[in-house]
Amino acid sequence: MYDYIKGIYKGMHKDYITVENNGIGYKIFTSGNTLYETPEKDEEIKLYIQQIPRDDSINLYGFFTEEERDMFNLLMTISGVGAKSSLSLLSVTSINKLKYSIVTEDTTLLTRAPGIGRKTAERIILELKDKFKNDDIISDIDDLDSISNFQLHSAEALEALMSLGYSQKESEKALKNVDKENSLEDIIKACLKYLMG
């Protein structure tokens, strides 16, 4: 069982990143929060790892903080919530805002995550709300919405830029230097403006 992996960040793909360690490239699935925090290509990265065995493979899930990994594992204890749904929830908002939505029984934010319907959101609230009542939860974090949207769209924007002929390194640099606009179209436009000088 791995606790964390430290290696060289080799690039972002649609729903995972590649980290090289001792000549081996590890395919690591990540949340939007972690994708947003990735360094420049070929720089060092450290991710806290959760291994999940499948019928024919072992999938690795990586997070920048132990807190995010703990939340990922906690979400997966809920019936009907798997790894993909847990990553979706961690991609649409911050951990604090997710906890706040659960404690205040607000399903709106939870159902923004792909794969999470109203019934699943209600089940998450029912089973987890008591776990967070004593936590220091930040409620005044509406300004994170634009960052959350950026997290959701960054991988798609990267793919679009590379399909236009820009290298992965150029595309990632552009994404790190644009304003966190709300729509995917605006993010791509801002990246193109940056790349064209």
Swiss-Prot record:
InterPro entries: DNA_helicase_Holl-junc_RuvA_I, Hlx-hairpin-Hlx_DNA-bd_motif, NA-bd_OB-fold, RuvA, RuvA_2-like, RuvA_C, RuvA_C_sf. The RuvA-RuvB-RuvC complex processes Holliday junction (HJ) DNA during genetic recombination and DNA repair, while the RuvA-RuvB complex plays an important role in the rescue of blocked DNA replication forks via replication fork reversal (RFR). RuvA specifically binds to HJ cruciform DNA, conferring on it an open structure. The RuvB hexamer acts as an ATP-dependent pump, pulling dsDNA into and through the RuvAB complex. HJ branch migration allows RuvC to scan DNA until it finds its consensus sequence, where it cleaves and resolves the cruciform DNA. It is found in: Cytoplasm. Homotetramer. Forms an RuvA(8)-RuvB(12)-Holliday junction (HJ) complex. HJ DNA is sandwiched between 2 RuvA tetramers; dsDNA enters through RuvA and exits via RuvB. An RuvB hexamer assembles on each DNA strand where it exits the tetramer. Each RuvB hexamer is contacted by two RuvA subunits (via domain III) on 2 adjacent RuvB subunits; this complex drives branch migration. In the full resolvosome a probable DNA-RuvA(4)-RuvB(12)-RuvC(2) complex forms which resolves the HJ. Has three domains with a flexible linker between the domains II and III and assumes an 'L' shape. Domain III is highly mobile and contacts RuvB. One of its GO terms (cellular component) is Holliday junction resolvase complex. Keywords: Cytoplasm, DNA damage, DNA recombination, DNA repair, DNA-binding. Residues 154-197 are annotated as: Domain III. This is Holliday junction branch migration complex subunit RuvA. Gene3D superfamilies: 5' to 3' exonuclease, C-terminal subdomain (1.10.150.20), DNA helicase RuvA subunit, C-terminal domain (1.10.8.10), Nucleic acid-binding proteins (2.40.50.140). GO terms for molecular function: ATP binding; four-way junction DNA binding; four-way junction helicase activity. Residues 65-143 are annotated as: Domain II. One of its GO terms (biological process) is DNA recombination. The keyword Endoplasmic reticulum does not apply. Its main location: cytoplasm. Residues 144-154 are annotated as: Flexible linker. It comes from Clostridium tetani (strain Massachusetts / E88). The gene is ruvA.
